[in-house]
């Protein structure tokens, strides 16, 4: 009889602890919350942040909230994106206790926690979960993206430019799936034709997959940027420490453009593109190196290399590329837009894009890569 009583008490304690941790995350606005507390007191959590600007800001808030809801045992947290596991964070009981007793700061917690891109074991534990709280499925976000392009043929004369606002409706469907519908509103440009018109932007359905062992996949179909419509498949592998990522992408598209004569014109000529990619991250200096070898839409082959320095939410980098006998280069940067947190109710949000990304391309020896 006493054995059954102990089992019942442990089960009730586990349910209570699981509910407390989940409630803390739900109060922050986290979505797709899954929690499992084992008999030994260890707790595994999965959550998705669609509230805070920047992944790491939301993760930090979630870590603090989860530790406040803990009453013993180790903590394992899986960060989701479109319900697909991306990152695993581990904290031992000693660190959690010292933080709650104010013996160490949150900064010291960050330095002692474990971070891995290997989420397989944690997701195996979460298969025992009973339900998912605050699901993102069916929620709609209206996101306004600024678009700016400057392209020069010489260093002293502006050649072409445009400034657009491109609001998009983004809706989470089922696990890994998202529907996007975007309209582009021109603000200023010295280009002609469709660039002066209100026109469709990205209208696409994407499906992501987590294949385990560090492999992730994505399939996207619809209307893309650069006047292309079709489908694209991508596969990538990343190591557990996140320092190396290898990938491949292939697609087939036709031309999709807004014309004066025919309206929205869609061609029948299918063009193929493909690329092999590699990315290396150096955490000591927050440097990211990217290399890509590709076959482009019109049959030419080329290589491109990027070097990007990350400063928290800011990033700036340079790139160089060689294709079809021509050498080109330029720089790019990303800065956060105002607003660190958005209010998201059951229906969704209306917000500005989290980052403003921009690049300027200069043609070496007067050559421009289109």
PLM segments and residue spans:
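Positively charged n-region of N-terminal signal peptides that target proteins for export
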Residues: 1-4
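Solvent-exposed loop/turn segments connecting transmembrane beta-strands
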Residues: 55, 153-161, 173-175, 186-200, ...
């Amino acid at each position: 009889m006493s054995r059954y009583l102990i089992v019942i008490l442990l089960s009730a304690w586990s349910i209570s602890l699981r509910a407390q941790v989940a409630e803390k995350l739900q109060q922050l606005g986290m979505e797709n919350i899954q929690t499992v507390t084992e008999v030994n007191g260890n707790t595994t959590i999965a959550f998705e942040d669609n509230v805070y600007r920047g992944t790491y800001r939301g993760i930090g808030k979630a870590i603090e909230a989860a530790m406040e809801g803990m009453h013993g045992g180790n903590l394992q947290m899986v960060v989701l994106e479109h319900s697909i596991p991306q990152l695993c964070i581990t904290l031992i009981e000693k660190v959690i206790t010292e933080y709650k007793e104010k013996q160490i700061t949150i900064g010291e917690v960050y330095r002692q926690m474990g971070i891995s891109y290997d989420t397989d074991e944690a997701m195996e534990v979460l298969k025992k979960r009973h339900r998912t709280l605050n699901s993102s499925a069916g929620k709609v976000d209206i996101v306004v993206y600024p678009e700016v392009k400057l392209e020069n043929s010489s260093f002293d004369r502006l050649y072409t430019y445009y400034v657009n606002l491109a609001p998009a409706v983004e809706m989470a469907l089922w696990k890994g799936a998202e529907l996007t519908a975007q309209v582009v509103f021109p603000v200023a440009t010295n280009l002609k034709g469709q660039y002066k018109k209100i026109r469709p932007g990205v209208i696409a359905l994407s499906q992501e997959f987590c294949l385990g062992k560090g492999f992730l996949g994505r399939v996207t179909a619809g209307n893309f940027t650069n006047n292309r419509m079709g489908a694209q498949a991508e596969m990538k592998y990343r190591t557990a420490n996140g320092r190396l990522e290898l990938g491949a992408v292939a697609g087939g598209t036709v031309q999709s453009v807004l014309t004066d004569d025919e309206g929205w014109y869609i061609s029948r000529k299918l063009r193929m593109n493909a690329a092999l990619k590699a990315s290396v991250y150096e955490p000591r200096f927050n440097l990211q190196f990217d290399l890509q070898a590709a076959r482009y839409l019109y049959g030419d082959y080329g290589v491109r290399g990027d070097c990007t320095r990350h400063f928290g939410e800011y990033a700036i980098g340079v790139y160089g590329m060689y294709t079809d006998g021509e050498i080109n280069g330029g720089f790019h940067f990303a800065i956060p837009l105002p607003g660190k947190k958005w209010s998201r109710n059951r229906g969704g949000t209306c917000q500005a894009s989290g980052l403003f990304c921009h690049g300027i391309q200069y043609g070496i020896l007067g050559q421009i890569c289109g």
